[in-house]
Swiss-Prot record:
Gene3D superfamilies per UniProt: P-loop containing nucleotide triphosphate hydrolases (3.40.50.300)
UniProt keyword Transmembrane helix present: no
Gene label: thiQ
Residues the record lists as binding ATP: G32, P33, S34, G35, T36, G37, K38, S39
Transmembrane segments: none
SUPFAM superfamilies for this protein: P-loop containing nucleoside triphosphate hydrolases
Name of the featured protein: Thiamine import ATP-binding protein ThiQ
Organism in which the protein naturally occurs: Shigella dysenteriae serotype 1 (strain Sd197)
Amino acid sequence: MLKLTDITWLYQHLPMRFSLTVERGEQVAILGPSGTGKSTLLNLIAGFLTPASGSLTIDGVDHTTTPPSRRPVSMLFQENNLFSHLTVAQNIGLGLNPGLKLNAAQQEKMHAIARQMGIDNLMARLPGELSGGQRQRVALARCLVRKQPILLLDEPFSALDPALRQEMLTLVSTSCQQQKMTLLMVSHSVEDAARIATRSVVVADGRIAWQGKTEELLSGKASASALLGITG
């Protein structure tokens, strides 16, 4: 479904090179020490970075140089990028039509995803009137309403308290299962990864150093467990 073949990004003295295959509907965690290339990997998939070499295909179609706006991918950041002067409804509506001219079917999609996210009673509010968790629900709704086959998460819930973070992870996982979306999530927490991803990828020094079952990482038995400070 998603295939990266020697996708290379030149960053100062460190060339980062990734090869990875992810099947449709998989939920995969991307783990590793800070500054080793996790976010770079997501940005290459999303198209925010242009690789120096290599190829990237989605469903067999070459998207190596496809602009971000035309890739079948949605991405959610820690900074939710909501527009402060737009209401919740308008921020979600941007995912359907950048001009916010929504037809009846699009209006229904917008309200359906708002109900799913539990924010249908907040549609007339501005982002500044919401809590941190509510803002991330709005940002997630904007991603999901686009119904792209791939969702990328770059630690969007790391600033939330533990209970709320777990709630959001469960919501993301359930939503992806319902929409049959492929999920790739950058995280610093193996415990968070284990909650929604049976498979993990460990990035170190601009490479994929290990990939396999998340539970193996948690057990301390994987060769990459030590990179994450986990001992058996």
